[in-house]
Amino acid sequence: MSKAQTLSAADRAKLEALIGHDFAEKERLDRALTHASARTEKGSNYERLEFLGDRVLGLCIAELLFRTFGTAGEGELSVRLNQLVSAETCAAVADELNLHLYIRTGADVKKLTGKRMMNVRADVVESLIAAIYLDGGLEVARRFILRYWQGRAVRADGAKRDAKTELQEWSHAKFGVTPIYRVDERSGPDHDPRFRVTVEVAGIKPESGVERSKRAAEQVAATKMLEREGIWQQSPAGN
């Protein structure tokens, strides 16, 4: 197993307080914060944590939305879910936890900026969720997720509007055409892919979105076009 760097006692106590869980196996937290790029042995262990954390997050958010929005249909719930488990939201949680102070990355990753660095922060949050789940169980992981996602779920008013549906209605009314979506690129490992999707509406400039599923990337691209054309107000940061 790749060896993770060890947090200081002070840093560990501070971070455990933010997480709301004291780790019984301290190395789990260290491993979760040590990105694959900082390990001497590259490979599956860190990616397995991301994989598990992504599934635990998805389950807890799906349950939260199901209970919170009792009259919402599957389409609305899916839009909200995609927004709340997106790389942008996970990275925002990482920032709220000040994980940049604790994440260990390789030299190459330290040079990354923008979207790529956001994805690293999102990956670490997923790994952290897996570590919490493995150390404390599902209820402890759920408590952590509710602590940092429940407010976002309630604030995400824009998610109740399906961007693709609204863009289609607008483009039909204005241009008499249906938006066309195409997948430009698929990257990343099988367990954590990234899709770049472009939406085109005849007569105006196209827009693109990058997300972890084609459906979510389509929503991002449609949202960008709606905001650019003044149909929607630009989403506030953090939502």
Swiss-Prot record:
Alphabetically ordered keywords of this record: Cytoplasm, Endonuclease, Hydrolase, Magnesium, Metal-binding, mRNA processing, Nuclease, RNA-binding, rRNA processing, rRNA-binding, tRNA processing
Gene3D superfamilies given in the database record: 3.30.160.20, Ribonuclease III domain
Compartments where located: Cytoplasm
GO BP term, pick one: regulation of gene expression
Enzyme Commission number: 3.1.26.3
Binding site for Mg(2+): 50, 123, 126
Gene Ontology cellular-component terms listed: cytoplasm
NCBIfam families from the UniProt entry: RNaseIII (TIGR02191)
This protein's name: Ribonuclease 3
Gene name for this UniProt entry: rnc
